[in-house]
Design a protein with these regions (language model features):
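Class I S-adenosyl-L-methionine
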Residues: 1-181
Length: 181
């Protein structure tokens, strides 16, 4: 990852925690529920972050942490927790205009009535497909899919790193295809 990110416990994902139990979904075999974030110290930190979402100074704290950085990824583990969480992320993005933000999400319900035109230009919300080899959601301009046969994400061929790729943050990339892992 070419930037800082924030993660939350994957078990707290509203939709993802359900999909993780269903074979053939993009959350089945979730890396964050397996090897990636299972150490007790990592779990404790993610639980603290989850609890902090409702703290009155969360938005100001995130603005302080992100200011001065060029890129930021929301939720390399976890997902949106509700409308207030999304609203606060939008406020953080408005206050950090020099940073490009990428917010991948499967929480479709939170976006279905949101006009993409009101989202700050430095925030790319990428709606993720729910099924492996399934179609991208057609109602949102920026999406991601997971495939067993093809990919556009170069990370698997680059030691798991983005290197100079920033497609996930780009409004010029309508869909990013990730290899199933």
């Amino acid at each position: 990852m070419p930037c800082y990110s924030i993660n939350l416990p994957a078990w707290a994902c509203k939709l993802g925690s359900i999909l993780a139990k269903i074979s053939g979904t993009t959350c089945h075999g979730c890396y964050a529920l397996k090897n990636r974030y299972i150490m007790p110290i990592q779990q404790a930190a993610m639980i603290r972050r989850l609890k902090a979402l409702t703290h009155g100074s969360w938005t100001a704290a995130m603005i302080t942490l992100i200011t001065g950085h060029k890129y930021f990824r929301w939720h390399d583990s976890g997902d949106l927790q509700g409308p207030d969480h999304l609203k606060n992320i939008i406020e953080v993005c408005k206050a950090t205009p020099d940073a490009k933000h990428w917010l991948p999400t499967r929480e479709h319900k939170l976006l279905q009535f949101l006009d993409p035109d009101i989202i700050p230009k430095n925030l790319l919300i990428r709606v993720s497909a729910t099924k492996v080899n399934g179609p991208a959601p057609s109602w949102w301009p920026w999406t991601s899919t997971v495939s067993t046969t093809t990919k556009t994400c170069p990370a698997p061929d680059q030691g798991g790193k983005c290197l100079d790729c920033r497609a996930c943050w780009s409004r010029h990339t309508p869909n990013v295809v990730y290899a199933q892992h």
